[in-house]
Amino acid sequence: VLKALGDSLHLDALTVTGETIGQLLASAEIRNPAVIRPKSAPWHPEGGTVVLYGNLAPDGAVVKQSAVREDMRAFRGRARVMDSERAALEALGSGAVHEGDVLVIRYEGPKGGPGMPETLAVTLALAHSGLRRVALVTDGRFSGATEGPCVGHVSPEAYIGGPIAGVEEGDEVEIDIPNRLLRVRNTDP
C-alpha cells in the first residue's frame, strides 16, 4: 500500500528501523495490482466514508457511502424519534418502524451517551428486520460493520443542544449523499 502511495508520502521521514520511508519502499513491490491498485485506477472514484452537512448537522455527520444501496443514497423519510438506542430497539422489535421512516436516535453522542457507545445493536436489528427503505440518523457512532443508510456522529450532538435535539416525530429528514446533505424539515402546520 505504501508503495502505491509513494509520491504522496514524505519519503525522507525516518521509520523505527532508522531508514527513511523512501529507502524501505525502494525494494518494495506490489505483488498483486488487482488488489493494491494504483491511484490512477481506484475501485471507486470517491472514498467509502463521506461527511454530510446541513441544518441537522451543521458541524457534520458521517456515513459509509460504500455500504449504502444506490437507491437509498438520496432519501427522504418521516422521523421516528428515539432518545436512546434501547428505545429504538424496542420500536423495531414491536413493529413501530415502517418502510419510509428515518429512525433518529439522539443522546448517544460523546457527552449524551456518555462516552459515545457504539450503536451496533440497532444497526444489526435494522439490517435483519426485512425493512429495505428505512434510514438511521444518530449522534452516536457505528462500527465498520454498519451497512445501509446509517448516518452517525451527527454534530453538534443532542446533549449540548445540537439541532438533532429539536427533531420531532413526523418531521421530514433528508439524506442526500451525492450532494453531502443532511437536513430536517419540520412538518408542523
Model-derived segments and spans:
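Catalytic or ion-coupling anion/metal-binding cores of large enzyme and transporter domains
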Residues: V1-P189
